[in-house]
A protein has these predicted regions:
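One-carbon transfer enzymes
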Residues: 1-291
């Protein structure tokens, strides 16, 4: 008997008035590009319903809330952990994960007054199971179509780690990827459906750069990240991370958000296949020409 494909739309409703929560932690450059594009579009299929940050000092979140007349929710992660007797806000320990769950539950209560059909994680740092409540689109500074020998995504990790890994593998280019986040407990970091990637952002390799990267990678062996994060490899990665943001993130993320709101994407959870207008399209490429 032929297996039946279980293809499902990501969105629960098909409406011309979708509402999105915009989550951010830092400078908010991705959020800025997405919100500006949306505001300029007279036929926009979604609207921002709330801006969310875990940092009381996030000026970008305050600015966007005022600029676009959108409510702002600030849920202080550091203060919450301190109130529960913890100085560090990580999820590496059982106690840390328990507090993160409490923090997320409190965030859910804070978001109840606002309509949310999906969320845009535009540089939102905390890992949170709020991603189980509605689809959460996230930009990632790595090409998630690149797999290791076991068929697993290779360029995963936070901040500049995917760029560093691409450099250590001597890859010819970088890409930004947009995924629908899943719980970090179920798929690990950077799991979830891959909706789109940016066009390649070339790495300008020279013999000297190859040697510098290889030497720095060798010197890292046996050391903790805090001991080497500002080494030559880290500095090169930081430069390329900025190039990737401009030529990758800012190109692919706004377009994927609009295509997502338009209902173009669907997903077969059994096979992990993403569909675009009914055709398999995992890792669909977006270029500046289509902006």
């Amino acid at each position: 008997m032929k297996a039946v494909k279980m293809i499902q739309n990501f969105l629960k409703k098909n409406s011309s008035a979708l509402s999105a929560a915009v989550f951010l932690s830092g400078s908010g450059t991705n959020a800025e590009k997405i919100l500006a594009r949306n505001a300029k579009n007279p036929h926009a299929l979604w609207r921002p319903s709330v801006i969310v940050t875990e940092r009381p000092g996030c000026d970008a979140a305050k600015r966007f809330a005022e600029m676009y007349n959108v409510p702002l929710v600030v849920h202080d992660l550091v203060a919450f952990y301190k109130a529960h007797g913890l100085e560090k806000t990580g999820c590496a320990t059982e106690e840390g994960r328990a507090v993160r769950k409490l923090w997320t539950d409190a965030l859910r209560e804070m978001l109840k007054p606002y309509p949310i059909d999906f969320a845009i994680f535009a540089g939102f740092v905390p890992l949170t199971d709020i991603v189980e409540d509605f689809p959460c689109l996230n930009i990632h500074p790595g090409d998630l179509t690149v797999l290791d020998e076991n068929g697993q995504r290779l360029l995963v990790g936070l901040h500049a780690i995917p760029v560093e890994m691409a450099l250590m593998k001597h890859l010819p280019y970088l890409r930004s990827s947009v995924i629908v986040l899943e719980s970090f407990r179920s798929t690990g970091v950077d799991g979830g459906a891959l909706l789109g990637v940016s066009a390649p952002v070339p790495i300008d390799w020279t013999d000297e750069m190859h040697q510098t990267v290889d030497a720095a990678a060798a010197a890292r062996i046996g050391k903790k990240r805090a001991e080497y994060k500002n080494d030559a490899l880290g500095q090169i990665a930081a430069d390329y991370l900025e190039k990737l943001k401009v030529n990758g993130d800012w190109v692919v993320f706004p377009q994927v958000v609009d295509d997502f709101a338009a209902g173009h994407f669907a997903y077969d959870r059994e096979t992990g296949t993403v569909y675009y207008d009914g055709a398999p399209a995992t890792g669909r490429e977006y270029t500046a020409e289509t902006l």
